[in-house]
Curated annotation (Swiss-Prot):
This is Inactive ADP-ribosyltransferase ARH2. PANTHER family: ADP-RIBOSYLGLYCOHYDROLASE, INACTIVE ADP-RIBOSYLTRANSFERASE ARH2. Pfam families: ADP_ribosyl_GH. Required for myofibril assembly and outgrowth of the cardiac chambers in the developing heart. Appears to be catalytically inactive, showing no activity against O-acetyl-ADP-ribose. The modification Phosphoserine is found at S27. It comes from Bos taurus. One of its GO terms (biological process) is cardiac myofibril assembly. It is found in: Cytoplasm, Myofibril, Sarcomere.
């Protein structure tokens, strides 16, 4: 249970750190931010209070997904209706500066008062953003057992598609849900990317059964898979071997910025559903269990650091718990009591059949 609570807390911590860094954009490069952090005593002396280090909609939407997953729904359609209701409800109350425009646009298409079509939104050419990926880790926590894979695929795709109806967007939610389930299962980190890519065809099969106009999707499936294939080849973990991930000899903040931009589709790392989870995964591989190193790689860079931080923080919590994390980062964290409650409930319900 502690690791489930840690996952919810550290997802929010990663979001607050990354979002706060992006908001202080006078220091757009990770190197400069890390220098500033060093002058202030670093992460050990930092206290994340709601006034100075608020969370963004990444955390609010993740909490909304988790909140829906712990309700007493009868069937998955009822779960989706509950997600829609919560997404629309929270975004109406969220200050504009803390909401991602793509997520706001996606939510505007939802119809909470339409019983049959509540979560059915049209294909969206602009729906490829990171917002689907950052709200779905809890889906993998709820359905982490290998025998629940089919449910995980369906729920993560639908959860992502509600707001980001574009394969690059909702395959991001499949990706983060799968990674969370692998963390709980204790799967070797280097294996996650391969196993995720092998699961993408299940999502495609599900979409073929449930979407009338699949033609709009077809060309975009390849992009997500090709980007991940390229990444796994670059890190030399595409094959089923015991190899550790291979990093360049020089991989400091400046080099990482270049690499993250290369992986992106628009020159800003972590903006899309393929590269937000990719940067988080790369940071986990490179951090080797060090929270400080994870922050350097996932929370403090010149891209969408709130998104990559939220994903990386949550997965770190599932892998390692809170022991390596300075207490000041979560002691006064915004929504911390509710995050703990959600983690406890997800843990309890994940062993029950539904």
């Amino acid at each position: 249970m502690e690791k489930f609570q840690a996952a919810m807390l550290l997802g929010a911590v990663g979001d607050a750190l990354g979002f706060g860094h992006a908001a202080r954009e006078s220091s757009s490069l990770g190197a400069r931010v890390q220098e500033e952090m060093g002058k202030g005593g670093g992460l050990d002396h930092l206290v994340l209070s709601p006034e100075t280090w608020p969370v963004s909609d990444n955390t609010i939407m993740h909490m909304s997904t988790a909140g829906a997953l712990i309700t007493d729904f009868w069937c998955l359609d009822d779960l989706y209706r509950e997600m829609v209701r919560r997404y629309v409800d929270v975004l109406e109350k969220l200050p504009e500066q803390r909401a991602d425009p793509a997520t706001l646009e996606g939510c505007s298409q939802l119809k909470p008062d339409n019983y049959l079509l509540a979560w059915h939104t049209p294909f969206n050419e602009k729906g490829s953003g990171f917002g689907a990926a950052t709200k779905a880790m809890c889906v993998g926590m709820r359905y982490w057992q290998p025998e629940r894979l089919e449910t995980l695929v369906e729920v993560s795709v639908e959860c992502g598609r509600m707001t980001h109806n574009h394969p690059t967007g909702f395959l991001g939610s499949l990706c983060t849900a799968l990674f969370a389930s692998y963390a709980v299962q204790g799967k070797r980190l280097e294996q996650w990317g391969r196993d995720m890519l092998r699961t993408v065809p299940l999502a495609e099969e599900y979409c073929k059964k449930t979407i009338r106009h699949l033609a709009e999707y077809q060309e975009h499936w390849f992009y997500f898979e090709a980007k991940w294939q390229f990444y796994l080849e670059e890190r030399k973990i595409i094959e089923d071997t015991e190899n550790e991930a291979s990093f360049p000899d020089r991989y400091d903040a400046e080099e990482r910025e270049k690499t993250y931009r290369k992986w992106s589709s628009e020159g800003r790392g972590g903006r899309r559903g393929h590269d937000a989870p990719m940067i988080a995964y790369d940071a986990l591989l490179g951090a080797k269990g060090s929270w400080t190193e994870l922050c350097r790689r996932a929370m403090f860079h010149g891209g969408e650091s709130g998104a990559t931080g939220a994903i990386a923080g949550c997965l770190f919590g599932l892998l390692h718990g809170l022991d390596a994390v300075p207490a000041g980062l979560y002691r006064e964290l915004e929504h911390q009591d509710e995050l703990r409650r959600l983690g406890e409930a997800l843990h309890r319900l994940s062993s029950q059949e539904k």
